[in-house]
Amino acid sequence: MYFHSTAIILFLNKIDLFEIKITHTNITVAFPDYEGPRERDCALEYIRVQFISLNNNKNRKIYQHVTSATDTARIQVVIDMLFDIIISASLKMVGV
């Protein structure tokens, strides 16, 4: 099981569209168990918790980012974080 301890990066992209759609479409269309309000932050937290609850390895790191690909500053932060993860994992593999 090679991927058992591999870090996961959860990208919740197109947040700008999500903010618009959540006011018009109930999130229960995709998540029937959701009982919270039609608010961005509440819905995002629910989605994050649902995703994280599927993780069977509590030592696995899960990085979560809410993004809009058109927001170049935010995307740069995410890219920088990805480089940090890759470098850290590479150093760990060689024992540094």
From Swiss-Prot:
Residues 9-16 are annotated as: G1 motif. Expressed in ASJ neurons. Residues 2-96 form the G-alpha domain. Gene3D superfamilies: P-loop containing nucleotide triphosphate hydrolases (3.40.50.300). Residues 67-72 are annotated as: G2 motif. GO terms for molecular function: G-protein beta/gamma-subunit complex binding; GTP binding; GTPase activity. Keywords: GTP-binding, Nucleotide-binding, Transducer. InterPro entries: Gprotein_alpha_su, P-loop_NTPase. GTP binds at residues 13-16, 69. GO terms for biological process: G protein-coupled receptor signaling pathway. It comes from the Eukaryota. Pfam families: G-alpha. Guanine nucleotide-binding proteins (G proteins) are involved as modulators or transducers in various transmembrane signaling systems. Plays a role in innate immunity and maintaining survival in response to metabolites of E.coli. This might be by regulating the expression and signaling of genes such as lys-8, ins-7 and daf-28. Has a role in lifespan to promote longevity. Belongs to the G-alpha family. G proteins are composed of 3 units; alpha, beta and gamma. The alpha chain contains the guanine nucleotide binding site. This is Guanine nucleotide-binding protein alpha-9 subunit. It comes from Caenorhabditis elegans. The gene is gpa-9.
